Amino acid sequence: MKFAVWAFALFLTSAPAMAQIDEMRAGLMLHDPGPFSTGKEDGVDINAEVIFNPLSGLSWLGSPRPFAGVAIATGDEATSQLYGGLGWEVDIAQRYFVGVGLGLVVHDGETDYDLGEPLFADRAYLGCRVLGRLSGEVGYRLSERLGASVQFAHASNAGICDENEGLDTIGFRLGYKF
């Protein structure tokens, strides 16, 4: 997972990627608080996300913005994530916005349940190495360039693999729009 984080950072510093970046958001997320997961894992995630310019070729889908991010778990034996997908954001009032995201996540958590382990282990069993990811966000624009938001994200294999305990995060993020 450390290699993936460094590769992600290297990609983001390349000139073509920098030219396409629309916004960056970072914050702290509660790790696995539920309600759609087991709550087995604990701690705080350090979250960083890059949001790219809208895809004009997908205007029929509402011109979503691609995003890529990382959630580095700080809890003992907690699952870290590297994710990406498409996001949509709508202004709902003068400075308020809501957003949703749909994508995939690669994680370093447990995928197989070992019958020799206790039933209530301290790691979520996620079944697959690659999971689907759904997120929702509510935010406030502090200025033309700065914003603050609360994001909830859920990662799950949707029953495709044997185990599917899922993983939730919720937290506060600050954003900077270029």
Whereabouts are the PLM-identified features?
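Outer-membrane beta-barrel translocator/channel fold
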Residues: 28-31, 58, 99-135, 139
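Outer-membrane beta-barrel "beta-signal"
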Residues: 46, 166-178
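Short loop/turn motifs that connect adjacent beta-strands in outer-membrane beta-barrel proteins
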Residues: 18-21, 53-64, 91-98, 145
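Solvent-exposed loop/turn segments connecting transmembrane beta-strands
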Residues: 35-44, 71-82, 92-94, 159-165
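Transmembrane beta-strands of outer-membrane beta-barrel proteins
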Residues: 22-26, 62-68, 82, 96-102, ...
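Residue-level signature of outer-membrane beta-barrel architecture
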Residues: 50-54, 72, 88-90, 140, ...
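Cleavable N-terminal export/targeting peptides
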Residues: 1-21
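Sequence/structural signature of outer-membrane beta-barrel proteins
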Residues: 31-35, 55, 69-77, 107-111, ...
